[in-house]
Amino acid sequence: MADAAVVNVVAGALFDAQGRVLIAQRPPGKTLAGRWEFPGGKLDDGEEAFAGLARELREELGVAVAAAEPLIRYSHQYGERVVWLDMWVVTEWSGEPRGLDGQAIKWVHLNRLPGEDILEADQPIIEA
């Protein structure tokens, strides 16, 4: 059996003034469509995690990340691939988040996250 493919991913937790966190729904046509996740995406080859976070949130949500703190790094096995995820808490950002990739987004209170259909790979973030 060949070694599992490794995918490096970065995601960010953005909070609004009411203390709610932003989650995004995977759009139709993507793997695990309809499930909810923290916004982010794959790192480009050689890209540093913070730079990738800023790029992904700009591309997906139209926000400019000015500062963020690392929260947790872990791996999750998806069939034949291993996803390494770097999760950040975005502490300073500007712009109004909107789903630029056709994804629905919503603000959710932290205590309501367990009731959302969050990807299994994002479960450790909820517990962090």
Where do the language-model regions lie?
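Conserved N-terminal beta-strand and adjoining loop/helix that marks the start
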Residues: 1-21, 42
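Active-site-adjacent beta-strand/loop module that shapes the phosphate/pyrophosphate-binding cleft
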Residues: 16, 64-65, 74-98, 106, ...
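Conserved Nudix-box catalytic region and its N-terminal flanking loop in Nudix hydrolases
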Residues: 20-60
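Short aromatic/basic micro-patch
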Residues: 37, 107, 120
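Short, charged, solvent-exposed linker or helix-capping segments at domain edges/interfaces
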Residues: 97-102, 116-120
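Charged phosphate-binding loop/patch that engages nucleotide di/tri-phosphates or the phosphate backbone
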Residues: 121-128
